[in-house]
Amino acid sequence: MAIAGKTALITGGSQGIGEAIARRLAAEGVAVGIVASSNLEKAQAVAASLPGAHAFAADVRDSAAVADLVGQATKTLGGIDILINSAGVFYPTPAGSTDEAAFDRMMDINVKGTWNAINAIAPQMKAQHRGWIINLGSVVATMGFGGYAVYCATKAAIVMMTRALAIELAPHGISVNCLSPGNTATPMNLDIRTNADLKPMLDVMTQRTPSGQTHSSAEDMANIVAFMVSDAARAMHGANILADEGFSAGM
């Protein structure tokens, strides 16, 4: 796929899909910057295990911190070709019992954090007339998931942000696309796979999944991203790639 020699900045890169993407891109010869907000030690451990990788700390909710991050990563990596917006949170927000702090935290990390990173890196990518931006959406951006209305809303916002930015940035040589996973085995959604109270929901999801898989792996998602940031995907702008084991195909 000829992505060796590129550089990538990955928010939320210390675990889950972000970590898998960091490992996959590094295996292809990409120099990766792994960003964590509260788990810097894990980011440093991941970076230490990968050739040419570096760890950075930044709270994606803080636009000034993200601007500093982009500047620091640019100097350390020698530029940034690829931005992966993988930072995010996932938890239930039932109507009637969700406080404003829980609402704001999810919106700020998932939506504002994605925007902050893109807003900070866009001038550099425009100047070099080259860039690949991959946002992490979700299958629930396009279908409902009871009890998780705020999460659904954040991911729908990211999908539409992707489409609008693709129109804006494509003339500058920048590709903006979105990967929307289905149920993927990561620490963020461990409760769905292990909580006995949620087993009926998981059983229904499995029954409705054509592949018969209860979940995808983070590595499955990373393999798709490796293609999306390659020249082989040069015709893709504003795409929302659903990778959900076929769960949404019949909806």
PLM regions: where:
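Residue(s) in the substrate-gating loop at a strand-loop-helix junction
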Residues: 138
